[in-house]
Amino acid sequence: MPKGTGKVIAQNKKAFHDYFIEETYEVGLVLQGTEIKSIRAGRVNLKDAFARIHNGEVWVHNMHINTYEQGNRFNHDPLRTRKLLLHKKEIDKLAGYAKETGYALVPVRIYLKNGFAKMALGLAKGKKQYDKRHDLKEKEAKREIARVFRDRQKM
């Protein structure tokens, strides 16, 4: 994350399991009033979210922001597509990568920075099944080593 970032609200752990994240970009979100209140309450899910470029604009799909509990008839649709704010050069660069096969734009995390909701958008390349298995084996080996060291310290 860039310097000066604030509180992390939600992370997309599935993105790190399914993709190699090559680059991340800090992007702004265009939100309605009840959406930012729900985000501050931590009621957001990035699990199946993805971003697409359409007519020179970046849009995030399937990002679920629960309705605000104290909201009334002006509450938002939880799964609506939301516009992301990037510089034109960044959009052009991402559009070039997104046209290549195997690349996707995936939300990595949502956080608050200076009172504004920001998203870390990752340029991701899909993992194969054997890559996922290899990562799980490495993770399990690290856990086992940490467990052995922890047991030795207790003795």
Curated annotation (Swiss-Prot):
CDD domains: SmpB. Pfam families: SmpB (PF01668). GO terms for cellular component: cytosol. InterPro entries: SmpB (IPR023620), SsrA-bd_prot (IPR000037). It is found in: Cytoplasm. Its main location: cytoplasm. One of its GO terms (biological process) is trans-translation. Keywords: Cytoplasm, RNA-binding. GO terms for molecular function: RNA binding. Required for rescue of stalled ribosomes mediated by trans-translation. Binds to transfer-messenger RNA (tmRNA), required for stable association of tmRNA with ribosomes. tmRNA and SmpB together mimic tRNA shape, replacing the anticodon stem-loop with SmpB. tmRNA is encoded by the ssrA gene; the 2 termini fold to resemble tRNA(Ala) and it encodes a 'tag peptide', a short internal open reading frame. During trans-translation Ala-aminoacylated tmRNA acts like a tRNA, entering the A-site of stalled ribosomes, displacing the stalled mRNA. Belongs to the SmpB family. This is SsrA-binding protein. It comes from Bacillus mycoides (strain KBAB4) (Bacillus weihenstephanensis). The gene is smpB.
